[in-house]
Curated annotation (Swiss-Prot):
Pfam families registered for this protein in UniProt: FAD_binding_3
Tissue/organ expression: Expressed in seeds, seedlings, roots, leaves, flowers, pollen and siliques.
Family: Belongs to the 3-hydroxybenzoate 6-hydroxylase family.
Name of protein: Monooxygenase 2
SUPFAM superfamilies: FAD/NAD(P)-binding domain
Positions of disulphide bridges: none
First-tier enzyme category under EC: oxidoreductase
Organism this protein belongs to: Arabidopsis thaliana
Amino acid sequence: MEEEGSPDIIIVGAGISGLSTAVGLHRLGIRSMVLESSETLRATGFAFTTWFNAWKAMEALGVSQHIRSLHDRLEGWVVGTISAGTPPTEMLFPESEEYESRCVQRKLLLEALAGELPEETIRFSSKVVHIELSGCYKKVHLSDGTILKTKVLVGCDGVYSVVGKWLGFKNPATTARLAIRGLTHFPEGHGFGKRFFQFYGDGVRSGFIPCDHNTVYWFLTHTSTDIDEETNSEILKEFVLNKIKDLPENIKNVVETTDLDSMVMSQLKYRPPWELLWSNITKDNVCVAGDALHPMTPDIGQGGCSAMEDGVILARCLGEAIKAKSLKGETEENEEEGYKRIEEGLKKYAGERKWRSIDLITTAYTVGFIQQSRGKWMNMFRDRFLSSYLSRMLLKKSHFDCGSLVP
């Protein structure tokens, strides 16, 4: 059944990129509807590290101060090997804004973004199953039989995006690595200070990052075939503890203290960068953003950060194209003109995001390969020469300013 009064802009997916786009449009006075397949906001992965580019995006969206108030600023990181014997190295971050970094809980960020939107912007339990052409419009079919008609369709629906599939994207490639993530709460304080601890070697990379005085986010990526995505949480915890057995006791205690329902494992996936060279990021009045556009391995910490970049830039390009607070003022006579403006706006967005996406995907995959490679010579080369270079590379890729919502 086709609904009356369908919105002019439909965003599929209430994740970071979807809500960032919706908030950006709302700041410009443009109404949108966000379709989310689950019953509530989802925060898969627990937390992620935010760098300079993420804070620029949050400032543009108007949520930066609130998020800062909930999370401690990191003062530096400690990098070492996963095995005993080699002392770790420490790097302190300068106090300038270019080095601002915090470990942000996804749930708190999503709630902050959702809180900026008018009521009923997000429509939960709304799974998209089919997209149909209808002149200058697209008809979006939901699993409950509802049909929504829209002038702009934005796919922010993750790595297996329905919108991305409509555009011609293939499913993401699967790596040989798995990631185990957890969030640990310490009622009396964790005692870690405000540093990002990272350890790697022998096919393993792990990190322990304080979000605030009481909460630590941790992860471990590996190439083991001993476990898979069906492995239960108790075995996962034992596996992680075995991999980090040579690390200091306070580090191991983070994993030991983690509740079993506060752990998750997933296989790492990415978009082959060459696919972005010939695939359509946008077509007609449809585009993709976030993981639907550029799924990447987590090795440079840019998945969530770049998703916010997408949201700001997409909202700005659409705002320029629409040139009004609403599309409702268009008559049938100039509807085609409005369609062309939107099409050009989305092409501009695609042009801005293509090479940035290719760069991030390629860098993340390469850094992950180097950090988790096995072998005596690779280990020696990495430990002696590459650790500081890789750390600088991570910071370099974060030095990107998406700009404001208004050009």
